[in-house]
Amino acid sequence: MNEKNKNDESKHQEDKLQDQKMWNRINKFFSRSIGQSAKRAPKPKAISKSQSFRILNRFNAMERNSIHMIVILSIISLLLILLLSPLMRFQKVEITGNHDLTKAEVLAASGINKKIPAWQLLSEQHYFIQRAEKNSQIKKVKISYLNMQVAQIKIEENSKVGLVTKKDKNYYILADGKFIPAQSVGEKPQRLPNYEKFPNDKTIKRVAMQFNGISKALQNSVSEVIWSPDHEDDEKVILIMDDGNKVLIKASDIKNKLKYYPGMVAQIDKNGTFNFQVGTYFQQY
């Protein structure tokens, strides 16, 4: 009988010791989590094994959740570091399709530079395109990616087709008839025809849009575009050519007829006037 009592008492002491260890573990966890001293934890009371098991399972679940949270935060931190890393920035931005505009002017218009992270250019592409197209000289923009290190900006320009003087100030005439100030600081002079004697901006726009329909080489061979209507043709235009010739042509026919000029000049070795108004003929000076 005494031996049985001793065994029961020993088992009871072991259970109490296990409970004490469990409470010590819980107190230690809470003291780390909220700064509460383990000494201030409530004095443990005797609990059953099933209660101990439930508490231990709950505690283990809390530990697992804490570990999961730490892993998630670590992954997010790693992603942020990668996104902001120099490795995630384009090392080169190529510009194509520009003739009048320089590479620096295209980049400035779009707001794109090497400091912009690759993810930002990818996610906000529409914004950069809209910003670039606000420039009067940029008609269309396309952004593509050759690889994760090289981006390409392809533009279609609203080309300069001439020069005009308005109120003692010089302006470039763009292909759509808009005007922009000429000769900005540091800008190289361009070889463009001067538009003379035009009565209004609307008439200039009509001729400019026609002029944009011919080749760049042919555009560059014209030094002056003179509005010169008469009783026979109310939209007659005189073109003074760099080669010493003169061309008479209807404004609305510039795109369709002036393209034949180079072939005609090649067959004539003297200077004179080429008339494209009614039919086509040459009159020597």
Swiss-Prot record:
One of its GO terms (cellular component) is cell division site. Residues 1-19 have a biased composition (Basic and acidic residues). It is found in: Cell membrane. The chain crosses the membrane at residues 67-87. Residues 1-20 are annotated as: Disordered. The keyword Phosphoprotein does not apply. PROSITE patterns: POTRA (PS51779). It is a single-pass type II membrane protein. Keywords: Cell cycle, Cell division, Cell membrane, Membrane, Transmembrane, Transmembrane helix. It comes from the Bacteria. Residues 1-66 are cytoplasmic. Residues 88-285 are extracellular. The keyword Cell division applies. Residues 88-158 form the POTRA domain. Signal peptide: none annotated. GO terms for biological process: FtsZ-dependent cytokinesis. Belongs to the FtsQ/DivIB family. DivIB subfamily. Cell division protein that may be involved in stabilizing or promoting the assembly of the division complex. This is Cell division protein DivIB. It comes from Weissella koreensis (strain KACC 15510). The lineage of its organism: Bacteria, Bacillati, Bacillota, Bacilli, Lactobacillales. The gene is divIB.
